[in-house]
Amino acid sequence: PFNPETVYALLAMLISFFVLLASARKENSDEGISFNFTNFTRGDQGVTLLGQANIMANGILALTNHTNPTWNTGRALYSKPVPIWDSATGNVASFVTSFSFVVQEIKGAIPADGIVFFLAPEARIPDNSAGGQLGIVNANKAYNPFVGVEFDTYSNNWDPKSAHIGIDASSLISLRTVKWNKVSGSLVKVSIIYDSLSKTLSVVVTHENGQISTIAQVVDLKAVLGEKVRVGFTAATTTGRELYDIHAWSFTSTLVTATSSTSKNMNIASYA
């Protein structure tokens, strides 16, 4: 059925993206990062794997162990730090990332806990971050700097009462959420745009059945993160468990600096 709110949200995201692209073309940038993994290869130096994360023979990046996914925490990151803002100018990067993933439930197990695309100061998995902490938050620390988009499959006491997509900043109590009608085993395609001019993080999620979910939130990256961040995915389980597999991932950022001499354009990848 026609949903005017969804159409409006998509148009707003497209307008935001083209404004972002026009701005990037007008100015010089030499601090952009761009990569595109249409699949993954074992031993690829472009990806750092931590915890139970592994690359399977079929080119899929598994964040949990397919043989024994109980009490798993897996993290996969782009291997190099990504400049996200510049102290000399105060400028903040804009970026776009697209990825596709599958969540596979396990017969007889409670489906939990979820997967997060994130930007964070460090590569390592935080201590005390199993299960509902999604491998991103140390439950014993009052402050955990990160920005992320979570795909949460289990309702903890701080969560909405169903599976959901959320935008997070330094807390798993999401700034904004939308219900996620997850279908086990189906491919989910995600595009995320951060527009530094409006400080808006926008997300479009397309499901295999054609359903589209959108969510957006103002997030000040400079207020949360240092000048360089690590970018990637994290997933965690306990006795409640699922399989979390990344099929493809692209990322492009543009950061204007005082000494820039070249320009990098941004693009949204699509996956068949």
Curated annotation (Swiss-Prot):
UniProt protein name: Putative bark agglutinin LECRPA3
Role played: Bark lectins are storage proteins that probably maintain stocks of nitrogen during dormant period. Self-aggregatable molecules that can bind their own carbohydrate side chains. They could also play a role in the plant's defense against phytophagous invertebrates or herbivorous higher animals.
GO molecular function: carbohydrate binding; metal ion binding
InterPro entries registered for this protein in UniProt: ConA-like_dom_sf, L-lectin, Lectin_LegA_CS, Lectin_legB_Mn/Ca_BS, Legume_lectin_dom, Leguminous_Lectin
Keywords linked to the UniProt accession: Calcium, Glycoprotein, Lectin, Manganese, Metal-binding, Signal
Chain residues that bind Ca(2+): 152, 154, 156, 159
Tissue expression from the record: Weak expression in bark. The lectin accumulates in the inner bark in autumn.
Keyword Signal among UniProt keywords: yes
Coiled-coil annotated spans: none
Assembly with partners or alone: Homotetramer.
Recorded family membership: Belongs to the leguminous lectin family.
One Pfam family per UniProt: Lectin_legB
UniProt xrefs under CDD domains: lectin_legume_LecRK_Arcelin_ConA (cd06899)
Residues annotated for Mn(2+) binding in this entry: 150, 152, 159, 164
Gene3D superfamilies reported in the protein's UniProt record: 2.60.120.200
Positions of glycan attachment: 36, 39, 65
Record's signal peptide: 1-29
